[in-house]
Amino acid sequence: MNGVILGSVVPMVRHRSGPVVLAIAAMVFGVTTHLHAQYMSTRHVRDVVRDSTVTPAGRLPATQAMSLNIVLPLRDPAGLKLFLEDVYNPTSSSYRHFLTVPEFTERFGPTQADYDAVVHFAKANGFTVTGGSRDGMDVQIKGPVSAVEAAFHVSMMTYQHPTENRIFYGPDREPTTSLSFPLWHISGMDNYSIPHPMLVRKSDYAKAHGISPEAVVKHATTGSGPSASFLGSDMRAAYYGGTALTGAGQNLGLFEFLGTDLADLNTYYKNVKQTNTVPITLLSVDGTSTSCVDSRAGGRCDDTEQTLDMTQALGMAPGLSSLVMYIGSTDTAIISAMTTHKPLPTTIGCSWGWTPVDPNTLDPYFQKMAAQGQNFFAASGDDSTWSKRNEAWPADDDYVVSVGGTDLTTSSAAGPWASETAWTDSGGGISPDKIAIPSWQKLSGVINSSNKGSTTYRNGPDVSANANFTFYTCADQTACLANEYGGTSFAAPMWAAFIALVNQQLATEGESTIGFINPTIYSENVTSSYGTHFHDITSGKSGSYSAVTGYDLVTGWGSPKAALINTLAP
């Protein structure tokens, strides 16, 4: 198997705002600093606040409770970079010798003394420690706004959102602490960006574009679900087509900001006359309710995203050992749990998008996943070409496998792949967060004049799968719908489950998991064997980009063929 050294996947220059930069910013903006104060390694003040696009509308009540997640920094980031270079280098004796959770902590996680210092700091400042772990590099805390302001030397202000009809809150300056070392990040200090699922309802899409629903797309004609819609099992038939591999022995995780009602999943299986045998766990990582009831949905159940994530993952890998939905209120709390939970999820799907105040926030965790042999698949979005307005993150992070969308046709119900074009709203393009181009996208033949990619910044997506309005869904404790929902939300869990098949085959051969797949698939796909393990999508467009031969910024390398399993697990 060919490969490429991960090397510059850890970019030398990113938009990092370390303590020195933040201290300078504090002086420029006239912020009072505290003697010997430690700034964070990441930003916490939104650009619209920093540049005075918005002005304070008020201040959070001093007694209002806040739940935060303190993230400690990596102990040896340079050493981790070198380790990742080795572990993804096929010529190295360390190739795919991944670390266990305790091994990672001992080499690269916070020391016990530093972790204890943060816990002591939190308690001494009036917070209750509610969760987190040294292995997870985080301390979950809860306390009143007054404690937040005093401990981190900020004022928690409210502002009119510049693009949404609501008030948001956030700190007026970069937080500091009295600790002897800088923290990495504190999640939960603002609610400027509310995470949203990467799915689209056809009727809403039609209304937004001033057209009839039937003008959006024709109904699926070759699915085995109601009204010929596609089921998760149809995607397995199209992209895998075999029976030997089911994901047996593998643990898959789903990244979720809301809970679900498993009755919706049971209704789906009852209606399509199938049975699910995979044990499902709804895991609250920080006390967030696992219920599907959402205040943003008027107190109603809202679990379309969560249910479709399960049906696509279970459809592709029906024999998984476990499927765990990691449910939380902050991104760091969710992903921290995903890097420490037993059994460890070695392949993960994320169908949510949001705009972090600092795109480097999750880097320590994504790097940790790569070191532990985990894969993180993120939906690339449903708003066409990436921009600052349509929230590409986390799909444009360089340690994430970005999954775009296609329009799939099969030869028959539950039949094999027949044809595929680019989905017209597939997210992709050049990183709006200006994340540096990783080493595997620098390979000769990846970026060219046909695909119009960047030679400076990260390009996406990496891969793709069906995302058109051709699926069958059951959700929200109400009804089941055929050919109504689409989005890259469907494609990300499909890919996560497909890699569970790869990991199963590797396990039968006594091998470790495949780990982060991008270095391998890029190096493989610039060779003549590309067409044997990927469906190269060469027609259709989305926004500024078109599907072309080879890699493109609409569908990436395309959708998987069964032969890809043998390429990754020879």
Pin down the residues of each PLM region.
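N-terminal secretory signal peptides that target proteins for export/translocation
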Residues: 1-17
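Bacterial N-terminal signal peptides
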Residues: 21-30
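Sec/Tat signal peptide C-region and signal peptidase I cleavage site
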Residues: 31-37
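Substrate-binding/charge-relay-adjacent region of secreted/lumenal peptidase catalytic domains
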Residues: 38-134, 140, 145-405, 431-487, ...
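Polar, glycine-rich mid-to-C-terminal structural blocks
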Residues: 402-436
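An often Trp-containing, charged/polar helix-loop segment at the C-terminal end
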Residues: 450-451, 502-553, 561
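Walker A/P-loop NTP-binding active-site region of P-loop NTPases
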Residues: 498
